[in-house]
Amino acid sequence: LRSRGLGDVYKRQAVNNTPDGREGMALGQYIAGMGFSNVGLGIVHSMAHPLGALYDTPHGVANAIILPTVMEYNAPATGDKYKYIAQAMGVEETENMTQEEYRKAAVDAVRKLSQDVGIPADLKEIVKPEDVDFLAQSAFDDACRPGNPRETSVAEIAELYRSLM
């Protein structure tokens, strides 16, 4: 979460190519790498990998497009973790929110950050509908999938891709 907070502070500056922004993002990426090397990743990365392989979509862009949708999908399996994500993203008053409210606030904050830095909101310009089944099977078979907090299936992953088109 520390890296998420740094990203929120510095990502907008990094997109504008400021030295402080680039330095802050480098630190945030380093801290995030230490975190996910201990706990694994999930279907956000599993779904992003075949987009890079099939369409040459940059991995970070693919992750940013997919993340809010997968956050919504995973929400029932996350306990109170989204409260801390919302706080790290600058959402105030999370202590006075219901679980549903802070989960939505966390997802909305991630979407807003992506929008602010010019990340596309969906996969319409990237994914061909006829490739969805292949993408879903590839994501399901990906080494990152077992780290997802919620069990999933090929059909559910395919539906997540379709919801982004």
Task: Label each region the model flagged.
Residues 8, 29-33, 47, 51, ...:
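Buried hydrophobic packing segments
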Residues 1-10:
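Single conserved hydrophobic/aromatic residue that forms the stacking wall/gate
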Residues 11-47:
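Oxyanion-binding "anion nests"
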Residues 50-89:
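Catalytic phosphate/nucleotide-handling subdomain of diverse soluble enzymes
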Residues 12-24, 83-90, 94-101:
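C-terminal helix-coil-helix/basic helical segment that borders enzyme active sites and/or dimer interfaces
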Residues 82, 92-165:
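C-terminal charged capping/lid subdomain of soluble metabolic enzymes
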Residues 24-27, 46-49, 65, 84, ...:
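Amphipathic alpha-helical interaction segments
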